[in-house]
Structure formats: C-alpha cells, structure tokens
Amino acid sequence: MKEKIPFYNEKEFHDMMKKTKKGTFSGWYIIDKDNKSVEFSGNFNRQFKLNKPVIPVNTEYVTRKEFNEYKDSNDQRLTKIETTLAAQGEQIRIQGEQIKELQIEQKAQGETLKLILQTLQKMSDRLNKMDVRLDKLESK
C-alpha cells in the first residue's frame, strides 16, 4: 500500500532541509510500507540531489486515537493484573493467619503431651516404688 504525502508542512521536510543546509523540493514523496522504501515525485535542485538526504522509513507514526486505544487497553490489562495480585495477596494473608492458628494449636497440643508424659512418668515411678515394696514384703 502506497501512501502519498506532501513534503510541505511536514516535519521530515524541515529535518531534511537542516541536513542539506540548502535545497528546495517541490512535489511529493511516496512511502511504500511493504518494501520500506521511498519514491520521489517532483523536482529537486542540484544541491538537494548532491547531498542525498536519508529519509527515515522505518519510523512509524501513531494517531492520537490509536495511542489512546493502546493506552486504554494497557490500563485495562494493568488493572486486571492489579486485581489478581490483590486477590492473591489476600489469599496469602488468610493462609498466613491459618498457619499462625495451627502453630498455636500445635504448641497447645505439645504442652498437653508433655503433661501426659509427666503424669505417665509419675505413675511409672509409683509403680516402681510399689514393686520395690512388694519385693521387700515377699522377701520377708
């Protein structure tokens, strides 16, 4: 697809004039976006032909509407990411609270287990004392 753009009132024309210092051009330049080439249609003066200015073909221009659409889509994508991150943060916070509760419960169970072991040890000591007494009684 070829696009015909007038040189007058274009930024590229002024940039080209700065590069060549002198030079006049009347006509059009045609950008072929498929081949990324530039064709000229019009009259050059001698100085303009000698300096052979290079036109940046690979640069692409975006309209304000296209930019706003891109910006809006980007903003929507970012808000989606923010909401998912917020939801994940909330889940992590809830899981952290659950872990703390489980740790507290585990500590309580550990303490009860220690108490049970202490009572069993006391019972074992009593039984040993009773065995010793029985042995003494039997030996008499």
UniProtKB/Swiss-Prot annotation:
Protein name: UPF0134 protein MPN_094
Pfam families for this protein: DUF16
Record family assignment: Belongs to the UPF0134 family.
InterPro entries to which the protein is assigned, alphabetical: DUF16
